[in-house]
Amino acid sequence: MEALKIFGIFTVTAVAEIVGCYLPYLWLRQGHSIWLLVPAAFSLAAFVWLLTLHPEAAGRTYAAYGGIYVSVALMWLWLVESTRPTMTDLLGVLICIIGMAVIMFGPRNV
């Protein structure tokens, strides 16, 4: 159950970060309304708050979170930007998830 909870928190955190960064991108690069910065700020504030809910030390959390972030970013690529990930993208995600699992669930007495 702990693994599922950690994965869930990491996933929600990644979505908050991606939304918070994607909305300014839409404003700066694609000419959308500057008002997108308002929900972007809320999303990034939620991202920071969500990081405080993670069960491990900050450095370990950030390192492990990166694996989930990569996964969610590629899902975003596919679902929001309509660009299908390549096989090497998917292999990279698998490697990142394995790395995240080693960091989060590996023994601490070494």
Swiss-Prot record:
Recorded topology in the membrane: Multi-pass membrane protein
Transmembrane segments: 6-26, 33-53, 61-81, 87-107
Compartment list: Cell inner membrane
Pfam families xrefs: UPF0060 (PF02694)
Cellular component terms (Gene Ontology): plasma membrane
Keywords: Cell inner membrane, Cell membrane, Membrane, Transmembrane, Transmembrane helix
Coiled coil: none
InterPro entries, A to Z: UPF0060
PANTHER family: UPF0060 MEMBRANE PROTEIN YNFA
Family: Belongs to the UPF0060 family.
Protein name (record): UPF0060 membrane protein Ping_0587
Source organism phylogeny: Bacteria, Pseudomonadati, Pseudomonadota, Gammaproteobacteria, Alteromonadales
